[in-house]
Amino acid sequence: MRDLNTIDIIVGIAGAGKTTFLANLLTNKIRLFNFEFNPENTVCLSFSRMAKYVLAERLQHRYQVNTFHSYISKILANQGRLKIVSNNRLNAFFTDRGFNQLPFLKNSTDYYMADHIYSDLNKYRLMDISPEEYYELDNIEKSSDFYDLSKSEWLKLVKDFQAFIKESGSDYTDILVKGLTIAVNIPILVVDEANDLSPLMWKLIETWNIERVILVGDPNQNIYEFGGSTPKYLLLKKPVYELTKSHRVPDNILRYASRYIVYPFSKPLKGNGTEGDIEYGFVEEFIDALSYINKYDPTATSYLLSYRRKTAKYFSWLLEKEGIPHLLFNDPPYPIMSVRLYYLYHDPDQLSVHDLKQLIQHSRIKNKTKILQIFPKNEAYAKSIKANDVFSFRQYLKTLQTQPLDFFNIDEDTVAWYGKIKANPDWLSPKVNVSTIHQVKGGEADHVYVHFDANSSLDTEYRKRLYYVATTRARKNLMINPDLEEVP
């Protein structure tokens, strides 16, 4: 057990500017401790890639910020010990045993049997418990809708998977496990989003030689329990600093959301000094309002949030039917080739060498291989080609621009989306994002619709944290499904 005197905790509510505060702390603009931070004595780790990028940007890249996974991967690679299993081989492990294909190899967001069993194979490792203990937690039995394994069958599957990983290479979680075998000496470790630490990640912190650990986060925003994370490490001792004023959330929305806070702060919570709108309505009402919002405030951003991916896909379908440009799960809902075609015919300066390569690959031009050899493999040369080798780039760009749409080997869906983008270029930069609550954690929008369809069998405190995260994304207005007034 780590000495609590070597741990310092900083907590903050949603929208309180924890990342900005941390950046100012690391650049010594804010002084909390009797020592100074610098890139030589401090390592910055985060739970997610998104948080890593945001912190690195706030620090103006003075520090190298990593996720636990990327930090360990770099060390293992330098030691010649990094071998990663391919998605195809990982998928084959499950399909060979009668499970369905993993979702990341399907063009779909539905859940499949293999995805659930693979989640269990990850979670027992992230929780740092034995597969026997994990089975006794009822995690397997709760997934009985998707598979039916006895304890002996589960343990046999674990044993087979361990042998498979040893032979084929590490998956994401095994790289974290291998982190326990490396020697790490760190004067100061700063962990952003510490509310999402798993027991395995904490074991890494306890195993490595670290003089001081600084944890930053919000225990009320731990929503990755399905991945083994826990907020308990932010509750090990009294925090050295609390950020209790939200710069994002209006006063009344914060008061509403605060009803669902599980872990209280010692100081009163404050909103941003404004009053937003809180109302109940169905998704169709919110979509009707979007048409008005987009007309009178084209810069306004909006979220449509749900717990289930299936619900979010339905919302996307409704928006598409109304012709409202949007993102789905933070990505455009259309094929990238549709965008390339639009730029080719309407804004060719936006095309990169890589885009042109892809257009050539999908064209009916003969000798494509010879043509593609003109362009370097390294994307870093794209700008110099445009400037210094105008002939090779522009010649083939012009060749493609003069061709009709049927000159390209593309499917009907790509053609249809090209037509939609041509009719409404706002599809290229949508202000509306349809997503799950988990995928927008850390994000914010002016107008937020929350459809809280979380399973009622989920732990009550977990449901409260989910709802708190969802409602505190709102900067101005919040609309909630009227069936959800009593949630969680």
Annotate each language-model stretch with its function:
Residues 2-12, 20-21, 105-190, 199-203, ...:
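Accessory N-terminal region flanking or inserted into the helicase ATPase core
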